[in-house]
Structures are given as C-alpha cells and as structure tokens.
C-alpha cells in the first residue's frame, strides 16, 4: 500500500472512530429485510458493513425476515400466500415453510456471509422468544406475539464477539412454533438487551409527508410528534406498527431508532456516520 493510501485509510478510520464513539461496546439491533435482502449485491454489502462494525467494537444483533422466500415456498405447495392487514396468515403448511426457509435456508445464507463471525439462531433456541398466539379479530393461524425475551443466549454470543443472526420464529409454553413480525422482534430484543440503537431497513426512503414523493422525506421525528403525524394521516398503514416499534424502544430507554432506506448501498454505515438516510426517531 502506498504512503498516500495509508494516510487516506488512517484518516477514514479516524473519522469512523469519531462517529462510532457513542456505540463503542454498545449494542445495535438491525432489522434486516426488504430489497436489501433480495438483491444479492446489496446483501453482501450489508453483511460486509456489519462485519466492519463488529471489528470496530460495535455489538450488532441482526434480526431478519424472509417474506419472499416464504411466499415462494408456499406457492411450491400449490397455495397462494395470504395477508390480512399486512400480516401473513400462517396455517400449518405455512409455519412448516417458515421453519424450513426462514430458520433454515435464509438464516444460514446470512451467517455464511459473515465469515465465521455470525451465529444463526431462531427464537425457539433456549426459549429466546417466548410467545403466545396472537389474539385478534382475524384468526392469523400460527402468528405469535412475544410475552418474554430470554437474553442469555444472545448475551453469550455477544460476549464472544459473535454476531447473532436471528430468524423471527417463537415458541409457546406447549412447544408450538409461531411466526412473529420482524419489526416487533427487533424492538423487543433491543429493549431486552438495553441496546443503544434500533435500525429498521425498508424499501422506502423513510417517513414521507407525501408517500408518493420521496423529496418530502422527514429526516427527524421527536417521539412526542408521532401521534400528531398519525392524526394528520402522514403515518398510516404499515408504517404505524413499524414506527410504534421505534417509539416503544425509545420510550423504554433506547437512545434513538432509525428507519432507513435499504436500497442505498452501505445504508447502515451512512446512518451511523452522520449521513442523510431515512428518518431518525429520538426523545428530547
């Protein structure tokens, strides 16, 4: 490496250290999904960035979904995937696909990209995600809601400087497996671990005043403003539960939560290094 290249690298590393100082030896929970998970090039970049953060002393917990793979598996059974109010209807065949694809294929493919630093887990392991059947006006089948997060296994992995990669399957006290919303899992784990930051990767630019115009991005929202934005219809539909996960985390003591655009290369690093990506939620 030439002298000027060494100097440039040293300067970049110094700048990165300044931005990462608030997160040194702290926990960041990343909910990973959307286009960044489907696009193979973006997927590799995300895993590279998480590896870099790990090497720089940030403790990253990765929570992932796997909607497209699950839908593909359901279609192979001759069924059409069903969704009501944004939640997947999960019958017995579908939960079997979830276990096979989400906790199996998808999880292990991500772990492999972390080059020996990842450890693949699902919520069933060591009763990490204890849940019960979701009670709603609609019967969603094997869809669960979390009643307790057991952090022992996660803490063990983090203390060994490993990156937990968690698929969003939980288990009830009878040993029945349930599919759980990934944003909810990420938020609950972040709260249970006392994480400093929650990051949710999406397929949109962030919270928009006009959902058809990305130039109307709202870069920052103080949590007390959220209800007003709901009343105005700016936060609507699937963004309501996603943002609720962010505000729950912050109100429980988290420093900040980001909804970021996963279509942007190095989206996680951009959000941590002071760049403009997505919407930041915080509390005064």
Swiss-Prot record:
Documented EC number(s): 2.7.2.8
Annotated positions binding substrate: 66-67, 88, 179
Gene3D superfamilies: Acetylglutamate kinase-like
Family, similarity comment: Belongs to the acetylglutamate kinase family. ArgB subfamily.
Highest taxon of the lineage: Bacteria
Subcellular location: Cytoplasm
UniProt organism field: Actinobacillus pleuropneumoniae serotype 7 (strain AP76)
Reactions accelerated catalytically: N-acetyl-L-glutamate + ATP = N-acetyl-L-glutamyl 5-phosphate + ADP
GO biological-process terms attached to the record: arginine biosynthetic process via ornithine; L-arginine biosynthetic process
Entry-linked Pfam families: AA_kinase
Site (described: Transition state stabilizer): 31, 242
Keyword Hydrolase assigned: no
GO CC annotations on file: cytoplasm
InterPro entries assigned: AceGlu_kinase-like_sf, AcgluKinase_fam, ArgB, Asp/Glu/Uridylate_kinase, Glu/AcGlu_kinase, NAGK-C
Entry annotated with the keyword ATP-binding: yes
UniProt keyword terms in alphabetical order: Amino-acid biosynthesis, Arginine biosynthesis, ATP-binding, Cytoplasm, Kinase, Nucleotide-binding, Transferase
Free-text function comment from the UniProt entry: Catalyzes the ATP-dependent phosphorylation of N-acetyl-L-glutamate.
Pathway annotation from the record: Amino-acid biosynthesis; L-arginine biosynthesis; N(2)-acetyl-L-ornithine from L-glutamate: step 2/4
Gene that encodes it: argB
Protein's UniProt name: Acetylglutamate kinase
